[in-house]
């Protein structure tokens, strides 16, 4: 199994295969609308705007597993992200990132990420960096601001 073997539903219900992102550098992030880290949407959007033409994709996956910080419907979450942070990168339907019902993509990402930040997702805005070949290169903690990832992203572009 690799990153490209998975699929997920976009906010509009469309099934998207991760193979659509072959040859791109990808950030996968679990998001929440009512979290202290929610302002990271702004930094993620800035990265996306600055590097999408060079092959960066950011995939947002809302999750309500951390103190119900994304309890809204998918349509409400999507509208919140667009209106408050101008998010233009792809947002997917709400998923679970931990437990038996964790989305298969997140089961894979947690298994593939090595080092101190492997295993269970501890909070919203955990970010996974994937290279152009679909390898999980790094897992960034929720407190890591998107701009702090820029150097690693540039190395892969």
Curated annotation (Swiss-Prot):
EC number: 1.11.1.9
Keyword Cell cycle among record annotations: no
Tagged with keyword ATP-binding: no
UniProt-recorded Gene Ontology molecular function terms: glutathione peroxidase activity
Catalysed reaction, written as an equation: 2 glutathione + H2O2 = glutathione disulfide + 2 H2O
Annotated catalytic residues: 35
Gene3D superfamilies: Glutaredoxin
One GO process term, biological-process aspect: cellular response to oxidative stress
PANTHER family attached to this UniProt entry: GLUTATHIONE PEROXIDASE
Name by which UniProt lists this protein: Glutathione peroxidase
Species per Swiss-Prot/TrEMBL record: Lactococcus lactis subsp. lactis (strain IL1403)
């Amino acid at each position: 199994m690799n990153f490209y073997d998975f699929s997920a539903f976009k906010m509009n219900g469309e099934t998207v295969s991760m193979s659509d992102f072959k040859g791109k550098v990808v950030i996968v992030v679990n998001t929440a609308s009512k979290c202290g880290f929610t302002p990271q949407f702004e930094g993620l959007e800035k990265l996306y705007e600055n590097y999408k033409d060079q092959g960066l994709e950011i995939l947002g996956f809302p999750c309500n597993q951390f103190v119900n910080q994304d309890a809204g419907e998918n349509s409400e979450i999507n509208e919140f992200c667009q209106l408050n942070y101008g998010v233009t990168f792809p947002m997917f339907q709400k998923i679970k990132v931990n437990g038996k019902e964790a989305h298969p993509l997140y089961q894979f990402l947690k298994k593939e990420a090595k080092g101190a930040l492997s295993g269970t997702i501890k909070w919203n805005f955990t970010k996974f960096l994937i290279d152009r070949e679909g390898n999980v290169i790094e897992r960034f903690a929720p407190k890591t601001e998107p701009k702090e990832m820029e150097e690693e992203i540039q190395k892969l572009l």
